[in-house]
UniProtKB/Swiss-Prot annotation:
SUPFAM superfamilies: MurCD N-terminal domain, MurD-like peptide ligases, catalytic domain, MurD-like peptide ligases, peptide-binding domain. Its main location: cytoplasm. The keyword DNA-binding does not apply. Its EC number is 6.3.2.9. This is UDP-N-acetylmuramoylalanine--D-glutamate ligase.
Amino acid sequence: MVDYQGKKVVIIGLGLTGLSCVDFFIARGVTPRVMDTRINPPGLDQLPESVEQHVGDLNQEWLLDADLIVVSPGMALAHPALSEAAEAGVEIIGDIELFCRENQAPVVAITGSNGKSTVTTLVGEMAKAAGWSVGGGGNIGVPALTLLKQDNQLTVLELSSFQLETTHSLRASAATILNVTEDHTDRYPLGLQQYRAAKLRVYENAKVCVVNADDALTMPVRGADSRCISFGVDVGDYHLNKQQGEIWLRVRGEKVLNTREMKLSGRHNYTNALAALALADAVGIPRASSLKALTTFSGLPHRFQLVLERHGVRWINDSKATNVGSTEAALDGLQVDGTLHLLLGGDGKSADFSGLTHFLQGDRIKVYCFGRDGGQLAALRPDVSQLTETMAQAMALVAKVVLPGDRVLLSPACASLDQFRSFEHRGNEFARLAEELG
């Protein structure tokens, strides 16, 4: 526990997380100041009257006068105003650090470029199936500080690289980096290793590290050690096993579940299940409860979600695929009876799309590209690609040629904000248009 009495605290960034920080300090007898670069940030009208606010930009005078700055993950630490405050000796942390200083419950910490939300939710479902009281949140759903108010036996946190940058006191009972693929190049100008270094912070002081045997970038800097348990497709303590056309989850050579019994589909989801099982085992959730959860969990919206099956055509919403690695995961091992109609596009965040080319081969694929970086994506395989301005135009083209046995997959490999409010908005539009056109 840390005593914040008498500290001058500034919170940067409102919304649910910012408000949870305000509540945290007021409950401890400290009235913070709040600022947000947005003119009308969400939650502004919910601030207590006693809290000073500054919107539209950063108030440098407040920052330099502070003892402690709690910064939103959306604000880069490299911002000149924050750099100046840090050089002046002001402590800069995030809400996850505040949580870790106070939390008493065991923590499962999950990060990675792709699959975080699915694995976080799965581990929570496994704990619930065992009758445990569990709180889940962080980068998904409930702000971490809200979880402090609950008396849980286990806390499962999804953590982004941005959140980990400002966290120093995390001591996870089990932690994982699911994978590391290029993302957020705008925030990590030094490249993939800088991004990876932020992710690796999740292993600091962790009792058990769950690593991806197929991705060396998920290993601790000094390599695997006695804390490490691995999962992977063909190798790892937890791995997949194909026998007579069926795929099993195996743990150290023992078959534990036939994937036919799972509602999740796709190889990337089977490895997500392995990671969740490894984490659950590490914190003592009974195996039978975990396996039961795997047979009932049907996945999260916008993550390889079947939204329509009509006239023999399956329409799949994978709008959460906001980077190249996530789309590669969706395409890896994907089997389609007919033709795959793949929708790509949006804001690529300066990413290198060339890795997708490998997955766009063959004559049973058609690619429909839209949005800000649609042209770059269409150039990967111009002979099978069509370029439109919007996703709706692309789907109208798909509807004219789709046949029974085909699959329509929105897995854009890009952020959505060039044309949509969020990846959820994009996914909901895809589902609406599928229903209309399918």
